[in-house]
Regions:
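Short histidine-centered beta-strand/loop micro-motifs
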Residues: 24-26, 47-56, 73, 97-99
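Residue-level recognition of conserved beta-strand positions in structured domain cores
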Residues: 37, 66, 73-75, 98, ...
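Short acidic-glycine-tyrosine-enriched beta hairpin
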Residues: 75-90
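Conserved short histidine dyad/triad with adjacent acidic residue
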Residues: 36-56, 90
Length: 111
């Protein structure tokens, strides 16, 4: 059965260095996907700097909705702006930082 999740009902995750809302996940009725809306403040406004991380068993798809950023990964540095997509393979350490002057807004997908 199809399910609609209103913007205000997305679960807010307590993740360091960013505001993250889990729009779709197993907890919201999805079987095989997780979708997050992530907002990262400009570097000079951040109280906490995020560390690199990785996903052991899944790819991550990062789509830029607003702003400018750079993802620092094992395989290189990837500058990103509105409309860009980055596919991060399993086990690759990475972190995305805001390199612009306004909020960096990302839509992140995991299988």
């Amino acid at each position: 059965m199809a399910q609609k999740i209103k913007a205000g009902n997305a679960e807010r995750l307590l993740l360091p260095g960013r505001v993250s809302h889990q729009i779709a996940s197993a907890g919201a009725g999805a079987d095989n996907i997780c979708v997050r809306l992530v907002e990262i403040e400009p570097e000079h406004q951040q109280l906490f700097k995020r560390n690199r991380h990785y996903h052991p068993d899944v790819e991550e798809c990062i789509y830029v909705l607003e702003g400018e950023g750079c993802t620092y990964a094992d395989t290189g540095e990837y500058s990103m702006s509105v409309g860009d997509t980055l596919i991060m393979p399993p086990h690759e350490h990475h972190v995305t930082r805001n390199t612009g002057r306004s909020i960096l807004k990302l839509l992140c997908f995991f299988p």
